Design a protein with these regions (language model features):
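Walker A (P-loop) phosphate-binding motif
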Residues: 1-28, 105-107
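Hydrophobic alpha-helical packing residues
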Residues: 9-17, 79, 203, 274, ...
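C-terminal helical cap/extension that packs against the catalytic core
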Residues: 143-164, 168, 172-173, 271-313
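Conserved catalytic-core segment of NTP-binding enzymes
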Residues: 90-94, 102-160, 269
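Short catalytic-loop micro-motif centered on adjacent basic/acidic residues
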Residues: 63-65, 138-141, 233-234, 256-258
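ATP-dependent carboxylate-amine ligase catalytic core
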Residues: 15-101, 117-119, 146
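Beta-strand->loop->alpha-helix junctions that form or flank phosphate-binding loops
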Residues: 23-25, 140-144, 155-173, 185-187, ...
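Nucleotide phosphate-binding/pyrophosphate-handling subdomain across enzymes
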Residues: 84-89, 96-107, 111-115, 125, ...
């Protein structure tokens, strides 16, 4: 939910005439998609100028940055003149490149099992790693396990942070429901919009948030349950929570799933969650240089789950 929550907040603040930069990941079709500035995706020339500036700053050390670190610094160069910068974390928490910057506010979407090889093997370990970077003002999704909420409150107390749990202001309820009905939002996008509205309210006021919501257009973000042609959806979800969101969206239907994932993802749990709505899995084979894809593993798991599986051609 990080991407859509961040983009909703970005669009809300844009509606109040703020200059906003939004950094997100992953991208679908073009690297440029990660950089949203002034209501549009950054163009090649803007990225090239930002890259030249980074080379001037880092010199030879630029080669030492990871892919995500490089992209994060590129975003900060691009967004220098913005009123607000919305940074989407990668793995999240103390090991994330976005955490090195001073923050006005943190937003914690629902915390689940992802990046366990970096963040920890238990939900509490993962949550602790993410919540350690809590800013003086923080907002956390109310869709958390109780032990995660308890931990968040404990860390907020120790850091003397102002932590709020997301809820929809009754002042916004009618306009919110009209918007959700107009754009037929699935459950997960409704929840992420609520979170963004609360963040906007914290940053501005309830009156300004209502004004922004009344002007809000459809979510402008690639790959978040995005219908790119009739009955053809693209989604970047890559963990069990995202799979559950897809179950809610396509409940009672059968889909042909064109799929692949990195080998370090919880593929069994993802496909097991999606099983009730899958007719066939088609594996999209893509050459990945840095991280191994799970082609053979998907065949094996699909066989165990009794799901028909073949190569996408």
């Amino acid at each position: 939910g990080k991407g859509s929550t961040g983009r909703y907040l970005t669009q809300l603040l844009e509606n109040l005439n703020y200059k906003i930069g939004h950094y997100t990941s992953p991208h679908i079709f073009s690297f440029n998609e990660r950089f949203y500035l002034d209501g549009k995706i950054a163009n090649d020339e803007e990225l090239e100028q930002a890259h030249i500036r980074l080379e001037e700053i880092f010199k030879q050390d630029l080669q030492k940055l990871s892919y995500f670190e490089y992209a994060t610094f590129l975003a900060m160069i691009l967004f220098q003149k913005c009123d607000f910068i919305v940074l989407e974390a990668g793995v999240g928490g103390e090991y994330d490149a976005t955490s090195v910057f001073e923050r006005r506010m943190n937003i914690f979407t629902r915390i689940g099992f992802d990046h366990i090889q970096i963040l920890g093997n238990s939900l509490e370990d993962i949550a602790r790693t993410k919540l350690k970077v809590m800013a003086p003002i923080a907002l956390i999704s109310d869709e958390q396990e109780q032990n995660v909420l308890n931990l968040a409150k404990k860390i907020a107390f120790l850091k003397k942070a102002n932590l709020q749990v997301s809820s929809l202001n009754p002042f916004l309820k009618e306009t919110f429901e009209i918007y959700c009905k107009k754009f037929v939002l699935p459950c997960f996008l409704k929840h992420n919009l609520k979170l963004a509205l609360k963040a906007c309210e914290i940053l501005t006021s309830q009156e300004k948030t209502l004004e922004a919501l009344k002007k809000l257009q459809e979510l402008n973000l690639q790959g978040r349950c995005q219908e790119i042609s009739p009955n053809f959806f693209v989604d970047v979800g890559h963990n069990p929570m995202a799979a559950k969101a897809m179950i809610d969206k396509f409940q009672g239907e059968k889909i042909n799933l064109i799929y692949n994932a990195y080998l370090d993802k919880d593929i069994f749990q993802i496909l097991n969650t999606l099983k009730p709505i899958i007719d066939t899995i088609q594996i999209y084979k893509y050459k990945s240089v840095e991280r191994k894809l799970a082609d053979d593993e998907i065949y094996s798991i699909a066989s165990k789950l009794g799901i028909q599986c073949k190569e996408f051609v």
